[in-house]
UniProtKB/Swiss-Prot annotation:
It comes from Helicobacter pylori (strain J99 / ATCC 700824). The keyword Signal does not apply. The gene is rdxA. Reduction of a variety of nitroaromatic compounds using NADPH as source of reducing equivalents; two electrons are transferred. Belongs to the nitroreductase family. This is Oxygen-insensitive NADPH nitroreductase. The lineage of its organism: Bacteria, Pseudomonadati, Campylobacterota, Epsilonproteobacteria, Campylobacterales. Its EC number is 1.-.-.-. Keywords: NADP, Oxidoreductase. GO terms for molecular function: oxidoreductase activity.
Amino acid sequence: MKFLDHEKRRQLLNERHSCKMFDSHYEFSSTELEEIAEIARLSPSSYNTQPWHFVMVTNKDLKKQIAAHSYFNEEMIKSASALMVVCSLKPSELLPTSHYMQNLYPESYKVRVIPSFAQMLGVRFNHSMQKLESYILEQCYIAVGQICMGVSLMGLDSCIIGGFDPLKVGEILEERINKPKIVCLIALGKRVAEASKKSRKSKVDAITWL
């Protein structure tokens, strides 16, 4: 397996940015879409619970409908080649006895993981469904980070979107999937202009070495 050298890794980390406008003429190939979907599917999660569902929107009319309920992100979404809707599972679906959890793992893995997960729910969350919901959202955002970095490795661009009306977008999607619980949107495509220079805190302010 070949890995990127130090300079290439540094370049990619610096070039990744939140793209605010995409090349509206750029269309993803089926290979690119499949690769993005696989990047999402292979995202890590605590206990390998994978408490998410990803909806890839490439239909222009549907994307336009969603964009209309995204406030100041409307033009950016319309210019994107695709829009990923990141949805979370319900807390009840992550209970150890749920159909989802009982069918998620191979039997040899399940007998080890389910008891440990059940113990964690009691010790860490005191069986609070609200805390379990927060845990699920944490896992979804881990996936979001992987997706955006993975897309950058493909030479493509992305923007995480929290500014939208989840009820309105949910109503649009309900015609196709059952009652989605939307965490965020990710606009995907090819940048139309070069990114501005990345601005970050200094290493001294951001990192403590012990």
